[in-house]
Amino acid sequence: MARVKRSVNAKKKRREVLDQASGYRGQRSRLYRKAKEQTLHSATYSFRDRRAKKGDFRSLWIQRINAASRAQGMTYNRFINGLKNAGVEVDRKMLAELAVSDINAFNSLVEVAKANQPQNAAA
């Protein structure tokens, strides 16, 4: 059996890990073991935060809709409920975009929501 020297492959593997860790601070960008640990953690954080980003954007959309609807004298939950009762199927992303870019269209949706409020909402 021929002897296998692994120097080339080992150096290539280490170089790839160090290249991935090139922007990190201190030992995490220079030492192989620290760089390997950090790149594994970084991949975990990336995976987690790609999923958290979806909820973050939904929260941002809700804040924008709430601010715009309160400017028209209506709370967010009453606005969404009024749209649901009216059968308007516009998602929060589109509502937030309307609130930012086309306030007249958003105001017309607020009027639709006000017209479709339950009569005993205060009781």
UniProtKB/Swiss-Prot annotation:
Comp. bias regions, Basic residues: 1-15
Domain of life from the UniProt record: Bacteria
UniProt xrefs under InterPro entries: Ribosomal_bL20, RIBOSOMAL_L20_CS, Ribosomal_protein_bL20_C
Cellular component annotations (GO), alphabetically ordered: ribonucleoprotein complex; ribosome
Organism in which the protein naturally occurs: Cutibacterium acnes (strain DSM 16379 / KPA171202)
Key words, A-Z: Ribonucleoprotein, Ribosomal protein, RNA-binding, rRNA-binding
Protein's UniProt keywords contain Ribosomal protein: yes
Protein's gene: rplT
PANTHER family documented for this protein: 39S RIBOSOMAL PROTEIN L20
SUPFAM superfamilies, sorted: Ribosomal protein L20
Biological role stated in the UniProt entry: Binds directly to 23S ribosomal RNA and is necessary for the in vitro assembly process of the 50S ribosomal subunit. It is not involved in the protein synthesizing functions of that subunit.
Region Disordered, annotated ranges: 1-23
Transit peptide in keyword set: no
Protein family per UniProt: Belongs to the bacterial ribosomal protein bL20 family.
Pfam families from the UniProt entry: Ribosomal_L20
Official protein name in the record: Large ribosomal subunit protein bL20
GO MF terms, alphabetically ordered: rRNA binding; structural constituent of ribosome
GO process terms (BP): ribosomal large subunit assembly; translation
